[in-house]
Amino acid sequence: MPENLTTVVGFDFGSHWIGVAVGQTLTRQATPLTTLKANDWNSIKRLLDEWQPQKLVVGLPLSMTGEDQEMTESAKRFGRQLEGRFGISTVMVDERLTTREAYQIAMAQQRKKSKQEIDSMSAALITEAWLQNHDAD
C-alpha cells in the first residue's frame, strides 16, 4: 500500500442520484457523506476539493451472474469522466448486493432511511470493499 494513499472517495452511480462516501486506508473503513444529483459536476468538484482524495472508487453495477447490465456502461463512463475531469486515479468495484446490504443495515438500526441515504450507505460499502481488497489492485 503506498504511504501517500490515505483518502478515498467512493461513488454509487445512479441515473438520478449519486451516493458519495469517504474512506481512509488506515482504518479501511468508509463513512457515507451525501447524495448528489446525477451530473452535478460542481458539487462533485467541491467534495473532491474538500477531501483531496488520492483515489476514486465507482460502483460497477453487474448482474448477479457478473455480466454487464443496462447501467454498467453508464457507470464506466462516469468513472472515465471523473478521472478525465479531475485527474484522480479511478477504479471500478463490483457493487452487487450493496444496496440490499445498505437496506439491511438501515433495518437493523430500526430507522427508516430515504433512498438518498441508502445511496450514500451503498457508496460507503463499495468504498470499504475496495479498501479491504485494494492490495490486489
Give the residues covered by each predicted segment.
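Phosphate- and other anionic-substrate recognition elements at nucleic-acid/protein interfaces
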Residues: 2-9, 15-137
